[in-house]
Amino acid sequence: MRGQLFLQYLFSGLIYGSIYAVVAIGFNIIYNATGIINFAQGEFVMLGSMIASALSGRMPLALAIAAAVVLTTAAGVAVERLFLRRVARGGVLKMIVTTIGLSIVIREAALMAWGEGVRTLPFFSGNEVSSLTLLGAHFSPQILWIVGITALIVAGLTLFFRLTMAGKAMRGCSANREGASLCGIDPRRMVTLAFGMSAGIGALGGCVVAPLTQTHYAIGAGLAIKGFTVAAFGGLGNSVAAVFAGLLIGMLESFSIILVPEAYKDVVTICVLLILLFAKPSGLFGSKAASSLKEY
Amino acid sequence: MSILSLSGLSRSFGGLKAVDGVGFEAASLDITAVIGPNGAGKTTLFNLISGSLSPDSGTVLFDGSDITGMKPFKVARRGMARTFQAIKLSKRMTALENVMIGRHVRSRAGFLSGMLAAPWTRAEERSIREESMKAIELLGIAEYRDRETGGLPFGIQRSVELARALASEPKLLLLDEPASGLNLRETRLLAELIVAIRDRGVSILVVEHDMSLVMDISDQIVVLSFGRRIAQGRPREIQSNREVIDIYLGEEDA
Amino acid sequence: MRRYAPALVCALCAFLLPPLLAATKTAYLLTQLTMSAYYVLASLGLCALMGYAGQISLGQAGFFAIGAYASSFLSTLNLTKLAASPIVRLLDLTGLLSRGSDLYGAPLLSLSPWLAFLAAILLAAAIAALIGTPVLRLKGHYLAMATLGFGLVIERIVRGSKILGGADGLSNVPPFTILPGLAVAGGRSARAANFAIAWIVLALGLLALVNLVSSRAGRALRALHDGEEAAGAMGVDTARYKLNVFIIGAVYAAIAGALLTHYNGSIGPGEANVMKSVRYVAIVAVGGMANLTGTLVAGLALNFLSLRGVFGRFDDAVFGLILIAVMLFAEDGQRLLRSSLGALTAARGRAGRRKGPQA
């Protein structure tokens, strides 16, 4: 394969792998705090990029992104407090179905607010034709932003969970809810915090890839299932593994074009998910024991 | 002739050996009791016998056939029925419907015949209903038959569960702490009931904490401690067994 | 016998509604009512799975699409070029082929719609049997995700395959002649007849499930739903039973898909969309999960309204909101219903009135 094409696939895998990893991390944070899968996770990514896109015309990009992250975080908190908290007694399945309903409503709301059109964000530095060169390969500087911000998210979360009181409290809660509440930690606040964080991280991730991937109202569902695939691949709850799994899946999807027509690209990823669920639901890097040691 | 024959049965969870090389024989038409302090492995043993758990090693012979590791529904089809320590009834179904589930192993109608309401199934349904009513009447709960079990008193729910197990006409009945939660009078009735059931031709294996019940009705007693069988014999022998008394020291039993 | 009432009502409606609507000059509603019936059939299949076996499936639209696409593909497949081959000759001899001409007058040799229909149903059942075993071993969110994944795979395949018409789907699907003179097809002249066919099929489907619920197998399913361990201990082969319901659900969806396609004369990838699966779930949820009559009524009402365009642009959003509302309020709603029912039966005295899952 020609070098240029190879690099193209590589970078595409990197870009999409990063966003899948970010979605997966969001899944994991909520899963660890609540034990449920938030089907609406992809919508947070969509909201972040769409809001930022809508605001970017009227204010500096950094401000638009900051506002988008804040607003999406608020949306995540609202979703948890208004809906999920009420359904929590009904069991895991009810919460899952509720998140499905919520993802639809959020998506339709986005459609009503911003229409069907594809939107994008300005490049963080330079523009769509600027490119850097490394080892003879040309790539957009946005890729550095993506890698950098993903790394920052992972590093930031690691520090948060290890060093801050809130982070440790969340880990305590996910390991042993009752024990944690006996120590004075309010599990419900942890859940709200988890949703807020997942939403905010998702929004940030959405913003940083938007210049290259574009965004529109319906990207949520596809991201959700791929993000879940990545999360499950690395073992639900294990976000460090999610990063590696994300890159792996991103690459797999990108390079699958060699064998499979473009129209079937999604099918490859979904088949990976199905095979994974049937063969080893605890994930490639996971195990029953490891999942009980879930970190963040 | 033994209805149940265990040998070298072992099962671990993580590093913990819940059942460690347990073996004994339960004679046909005996009432065999399995006793032991909490954590001795009694419920795990039951689960190994009924197929809910598969053993790490050892064999389970039921009525002459090797059923080691067989799935519970297959074991049930061979004539073993059980009750559970925590009542496992269908809360939304009536008592009669719950007992009718017990007849599942004695009937054949499948999905297609069910959906088409094939004529021959009507006769079978009638027979299922009649046999279930017999079990219900035996346990004296006929007045509750059309009530949802979720709303019934605890003691009655236990009876429904027992009727369900009986309706399957088992060769061996496993009772998991049947007296738990019952008062003195109810326990007395239960003792009479168990003996009556045995007298109708059902071998009984019972796990129980209530010592008076155990000593009263058992033909054989098996004592477990920390997953091992430490004694077996008739009630009087067990009562005077030094080791058994030792493991129960500090435990308050009737 | 009270449990047969809804099916009987459907059958009656099949014959009574068309003249009634004709008299009130609202016969145009027959089209949407016919389509609604087919969608409800798919929901009924899902109700059996979700309500009685307690398994969620977000892939029902996938089976609907399999039935629809397989049936239409096989009945539009032109075998003229292969007319000489032995297989085609054999099929011709046994009367399993039908002749016609296409839009341009050229000869058209294709599988008889009955054969295509049966093949489509068998295909759906086979696929359900294949994926059901591993899928049903999963629990909770893994099961939801797996069925969602299945639905997405089907949608991507039908949308991306040229041979299945790609984004445009298949059209010119021939009528499906059930009996001489009676065919599932579009067209105003056949409107009343097609309405009757749809509602009779619906009535039969409902009847079969009502029978199932009160049969030995249905009892075992309910026990399975309430506690797999106890059901297994009582001799119920839980894995096989769950699989059987899964297959039944798939077959119902496939039949609905095939018949609807012949009625509409065309099929597109939109029918395999995740949103459609969500609709089926929402309808079952509103109906009360294990409530066949509830699913019937909710399904007919919601589908009819949706097809009439009452929800406008908010069509998808409505179903999403319904899902949320049901999840939030259903427990309380059901409890409310039960306590008022309880008050009623208490007033009647302890006549040992039967309660339990509604059929």
Residue ranges and their predicted role:
Chain A
Residues 82, 113, 118, 175-189, ...:
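Cytosolic-side transmembrane-helix boundaries in multi-pass membrane proteins
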Residues 20, 59-70, 192-202, 206-273:
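Transmembrane alpha-helical segments in multi-pass inner-membrane proteins
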Residues 27, 59-102, 109, 244-249, ...:
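Alpha-helical transmembrane segments within multi-pass membrane transporters and channels
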Residues 11, 33-78, 82:
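Membrane-embedded helix boundary and interhelical linker motif in transport proteins
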Residues 16, 138-216, 239-244:
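Helix-loop-helix "hairpin" substructures at the membrane interface of multi-pass membrane proteins
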Residues 1-22, 51, 59-64, 90-95, ...:
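Membrane-interfacial amphipathic/re-entrant helices at transmembrane-helix boundaries
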Residues 27-49, 89-94, 166-169, 187, ...:
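Short, non-helical or kinked segments that cap or interrupt transmembrane helices
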Residues 33-37, 74-118, 160-167, 221-236:
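Short loop segments and helix-boundary regions at transmembrane helix junctions
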